[in-house]
């Protein structure tokens, strides 16, 4: 797996630059596809700006146009157990937390209705690292790869990457969410039961200690980053 914390830098002051999107899907072969081929084009495709309202319907996939973007996006075919990923359009520069979730897509991955219920489960996460009370992170990584769970049942899915930038997260609404959703058709699956299941939006209130956090002034009893959302499904 490729984490985005491989080359580390120490956070000592807020960063104001470095917005990004996740337009490219990484196929099992390692091929990086073109922009917005298998990933739904997002509203920030020009600005690269984040989502900050965790209660907004846009928080799910941040599509350019929910009714049309899904149908204009291709669906990638992969197998359960394959290693796939996302590539950002620039370095994942802001310090924070990253996770990947999936949802069965009904009636299909290219449907605007896909992922609208309590159907999402987490398959991967990267927690920020802290050394001597300071967060350390990679300032150069663009690619994030992970494994589709081997026991995941066959079918069509949405695959959602989310990086939560924490550099200005000390007040409510300050955390920045960088989001992308790919459309998948999973073959050669198993008979696992994914979970815990959550809704998006609905998975966060914005007051979670892993979202509302001052990474520059941690409490003396800080023991590690508390990841928000459900636990990773070990399927």
Swiss-Prot record:
How the cofactor is bound: the record states:
Binds 1 copper ion per subunit.
Q: Would you list which residues are glycosylated?
A: 29, 221
Which GO molecular-function terms appear in the entry?
A: metal ion binding; monooxygenase activity
Task: Report the EC number(s), separated by commas if there are several.
Answer: 1.14.99.56
Use in biotech reads:
Lignocellulose is the most abundant polymeric composite on Earth and is a recalcitrant but promising renewable substrate for industrial biotechnology applications. Together with cellobiose dehydrogenases (CDHs) an enzymatic system capable of oxidative cellulose cleavage is formed, which increases the efficiency of cellulases and put LPMOs at focus of biofuel research.
What is this enzyme's class at the first EC digit? oxidoreductase
- Listed binding positions for Cu(2+) are 19, 94, 178
Quote the subcellular location field of this record: Secreted
* Disulfide topology: 61-181
The leader peptide range reads 1-18
CDD domains this protein is in? LPMO_AA9
Q: Which UniProt keywords apply?
A: Carbohydrate metabolism, Cellulose degradation, Copper, Disulfide bond, Glycoprotein, Metal-binding, Monooxygenase, Oxidoreductase, Polysaccharide degradation, Secreted, Signal
- Cofactor(s) annotated in UniProt: Cu(2+)
> A GO term (biological process) for this protein?
cellulose catabolic process
Q: Where is this protein chiefly located? A: secreted
**Catalysed reaction equations from the record:** [(1->4)-beta-D-glucosyl]n+m + reduced acceptor + O2 = 4-dehydro-beta-D-glucosyl-[(1->4)-beta-D-glucosyl]n-1 + [(1->4)-beta-D-glucosyl]m + acceptor + H2O
Positions annotated to bind O2: 167, 176
Coiled coil regions, renumbered to chain: none
Identify one Gene Ontology CC term for this UniProt entry.
extracellular region
Q: What does this protein's UniProt record list under function?
A: Lytic polysaccharide monooxygenase (LPMO) that depolymerizes crystalline and amorphous polysaccharides via the oxidation of scissile alpha- or beta-(1-4)-glycosidic bonds, yielding only C1 oxidation products. Catalysis by LPMOs requires the reduction of the active-site copper from Cu(II) to Cu(I) by a reducing agent and H(2)O(2) or O(2) as a cosubstrate.
Q: What is known of its domains?
A: Has a modular structure: an endo-beta-1,4-glucanase catalytic module at the N-terminus, a linker rich in serines and threonines, and a C-terminal carbohydrate-binding module (CBM). The CBM domain is essential for binding to and subsequent oxidative degradation of polysaccharide substrate.
Please state which protein family the record places this protein in.
Belongs to the polysaccharide monooxygenase AA9 family.
Q: What is this protein called?
A: AA9 family lytic polysaccharide monooxygenase D
The uppermost taxa in this organism's lineage are: Eukaryota, Fungi, Dikarya, Basidiomycota, Agaricomycotina
The encoding gene: LPMO9D
């Amino acid at each position: 797996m490729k984490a985005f914390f491989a080359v580390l830098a120490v956070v000592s002051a807020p960063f104001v630059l470095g917005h990004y999107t996740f337009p490219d899907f990484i196929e099992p072969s390692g091929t990086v596809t073109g922009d917005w081929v298998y990933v739904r084009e997002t509203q920030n495709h020009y600005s690269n700006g984040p989502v900050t309202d965790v209660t907004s319907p846009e928080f799910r996939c941040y599509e350019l146009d929910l009714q049309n973007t899904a149908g204009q996006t291709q669906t990638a075919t992969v197998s359960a157990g394959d290693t796939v990923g996302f590539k950002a359009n620039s370095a994942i520069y802001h310090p924070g937390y990253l996770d990947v979730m999936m949802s069965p897509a009904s009636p299909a991955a290219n449907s605007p209705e896909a992922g609208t219920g309590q159907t999402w489960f987490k398959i991967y996460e990267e927690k920020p690292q802290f050394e001597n009370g300071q967060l350390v992170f990679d300032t150069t990584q663009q690619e994030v790869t992970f494994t589709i769970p081997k026991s995941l049942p066959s079918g069509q899915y949405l695959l959602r990457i989310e990086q939560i930038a924490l550099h200005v997260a000390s007040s409510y609404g300050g955390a920045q969410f960088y989001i992308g959703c790919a459309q998948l058709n999973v073959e050669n699956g198993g008979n696992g039961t994914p979970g815990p299941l959550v809704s998006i939006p609905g998975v966060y209130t914005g007051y979670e200690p892993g979202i509302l956090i001052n990474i520059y002034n941690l409490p003396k009893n800080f023991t590690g980053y508390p990841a928000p959302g459900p636990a990773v499904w070990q399927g």
